[in-house]
Amino acid sequence: VLVVGGGMVGAETADFLAEQGHEVSVIEMRDAIGPDVIHEHRIFLMEAFEKYGIEQITSAAVSAIFSDGVSYKNAADKSDETIYEARGFDTVVLSMGFSSRYTHRDGQNVVYDFADELKDIVPEVHVVGDAVRARRALDATKEAYDVALKL
């Protein structure tokens, strides 16, 4: 499983999936996994990454998403135009802090449905949390849990 996004949600998702027996890799644009996680919790989370052998790819700006992985550039060195790939995964989980819909693109007010675009390249798309609609955290967490059990 490749988890795209190594913030709090992505890191915890990776931990959960690894705990369930999946081989997991996480790709993150920033230079560390879980920089937004509370320090004390991050210690335990990174111990879990070590325990389960979760691969960490950092400083990686994803440029394309495929059904089996992603291509990316070096986010730490803007002069490096090399395109790298992380491919061969059976599942790609997006946890990029990205709304599935937004209303501003290239200076224009538009409605863009990212989930619909993904349906052309992957067999399943599950939109969860506030990307569906704003609501109580408990409801969104339950919804994400139900989807994670299906993976």
Regions found by a protein language model. Give the residues of each.
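A glycine-rich phosphate-binding loop feature that marks nucleotide/adenosyl-phosphate handling sites
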Residues: V1, G7, S63-I65
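A Rossmann-like FAD-binding core segment of flavoenzymes
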Residues: A11, A18-F114
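A conserved FAD-binding loop/helix module that cradles the flavin
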Residues: G6-F16, A32-H41, Y102-H104, V110-D113, ...
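Hydrophobic Val/Ile/Leu positions in short beta-strands of Rossmann-like dinucleotide-binding domains
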Residues: V3-V4, V26
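C-terminal non-catalytic scaffold/interaction domains in large multidomain proteins
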Residues: V1-V3, E85-A86
